[in-house]
From Swiss-Prot:
SUPFAM superfamilies: P-loop containing nucleoside triphosphate hydrolases, TrpR-like. The gene is dnaA. The keyword Metal-binding does not apply. Residues 1-69 are annotated as: Domain I, interacts with DnaA modulators. This is Chromosomal replication initiator protein DnaA.
Length: 440
């Protein structure tokens, strides 16, 4: 019966949602026509009740009949002390600076980061409720953004709470300095008594550093036992923190663990648009799409690519078209995605595809408009984009040197006069060259 119910639910949600929200989901008991489900924590319980109530209701009714009901329970962690009161508001103070650009409003949500985003937002709205929150993911996926978004949200909405954002390296350095200066008590007072929300970035930096791990362990316990919120970020999940004390890893896992996955192409496009909005810049849609399609390893590089294009546009006073973007961003594209290509032979094939003229017509002496236009476009792109020599172009297109020079000039003059149709064809040819060069 249990497996039938789970299978019925699974057929009603997509694979991504199942992996994201139902990973800790199970049937705890079936008593008559009532099903009791269990999940890993309160956050998931409330999310499923809010977003998937009808799905669960229909599933249990299909298996047990129309009178079937259900409830969701969660495994609550028992703290070391009996203290369970909400956070007591303290004097208004931000103990460490935060980047004002790192807000929930500026964070673009997609399938790969939805769970982490909503978990962080809930922690910001209800400090101490999901404790600790452990966010992990690869470089440049938004961990620091979410971590500081929590801090910025709390500062704006709960100004009496004391927020501290630190990197693990900063925590280590503070500890070392306090020991050298004989001020260990002041260190412990700072991190254990004078903070309501502790945000720790890059905890993997402490791998192999047993002494500071011990200090972090006791700091964690004291804050948690006092109902203070702890949020930790890492580039890997807790159980993969090698050379970390087991007791500390278990503390990281006892709350809410959320993974950040690389954004899909549509999310990257949305992120790129948001970055443009923040920078108050503009780029053509085809350029933005090119960046999102090809700079896909992390968001820092995506931002770097956009900044480079905007700086070029500002310093030169020129608009950035697709051709220019491809040239400017060659260092941002993964080298293993670039394949060798015969420049002009493949160019002729692409021109034929874009214009509708056959390869034979392009290389013939035909003077019909389609063939003539295609031929001139091919020579222009070969000269200005592929940077081929006039001699090579003449040989490949079966034309004399003067004819090539004249053809390139005619296209250039036509573009200067604002021939939008011709420009569109050339942009399409260049775009196809880049897609082929970057495929695989």
């Amino acid at each position: 019966m249990k497996e039938r119910i789970l299978q019925e639910i699974k057929t009603r949600v997509n694979r991504k949602s199942w992996e994201l929200w139902f990973s800790s989901f199970d049937v705890k008991s079936i008593e008559g026509n009532k099903v009791v489900f269990s999940v890993g924590n309160l956050f998931i319980k409330e999310w499923l009740e809010k977003k998937y109530y009808s799905v669960l209701s229909k599933a249990v009714k299909v298996v047990l009949g129309n009178d079937a009901t259900f409830e969701i329970t969660y495994e609550a962690f028992e703290p070391h002390s009996s203290y369970s009161e909400p956070l007591v508001k303290k004097r208004a103070v931000l103990l460490t600076p935060l980047n004002p650009d790192y807000t929930f409003e500026n964070f673009v949500v997609g399938p790969g980061n939805s769970f982490a985003y909503h978990a962080a937002l809930e922690v910001a709205k209800h400090p101490g409720r999901y404790n600790p929150l452990f966010i992990y993911g690869g470089v440049g996926l938004g961990k620091t953004h979410l971590l500081q978004s929590i801090g910025n949200y709390v500062v704006q909405n709960e100004p009496d709470l004391r927020v501290m954002y630190i990197t693990s390296e900063k925590f280590l350095n503070d500890l070392v300095d306090s020991m050298k200066e004989g001020k260990l008590n002041e260190f412990r007072e700072k991190y254990r008594k004078k903070v309501d929300i502790l945000l720790i970035d890059d905890v993997q930096f402490l791998i192999g550093k047993t002494g500071v791990q011990t200090e972090l362990f006791h700091t964690f316990n004291e804050l948690h036992d006092s109902g203070k919120q702890i949020v930790i970020c890492s580039d890997r999940e807790p159980q993969k923190l090698s050379e970390f004390q087991d007791r500390l890893v278990s503390r990281f896992q006892m709350g809410l663990v959320a993974k950040l996955e690389p954004p899909d192409e549509e999310t990257r496009k949305s992120i790129a648009r948001k970055m443009l909005e923040i920078e108050h810049g503009e780029l053509p849609e085809e350029v933005l799409n090119f960046v999102a399609e090809n700079v896909d390893d992390n968001l820092r590089r995506l931002r770097g690519a956009i900044i480079k294009l905007l700086v070029y546009k500002e310093t030169t006073g020129k608009e950035v078209d697709l051709k220019e973007a491809i040239l400017l961003l060659k260092d941002f594209i993964k080298s293993n995605r670039v394949k060798a290509m015969d420049p002009i032979d493949e160019l002729i094939e692409i021109v034929a595809k874009v214009t509708g003229a056959s390869r034979e017509e392009i290389l013939s002496n035909s003077r019909n408009v389609k063939a003539l236009t295609a031929r001139r476009i091919g020579m222009y792109v070969a000269k200005n984009y592929l940077k081929s020599s006039l001699r090579t172009i003449a040989e490949k297109f079966n034309r004399s040197h003067p004819v090539v020079v004249d053809s390139v000039k005619k296209v250039k003059d036509s573009l200067l006069k604002g021939n939008k149709q011709l420009k569109a064809l050339i942009d399409e040819v260049i775009g196809e060259i880049s897609r082929r060069a970057l495929s695989g």
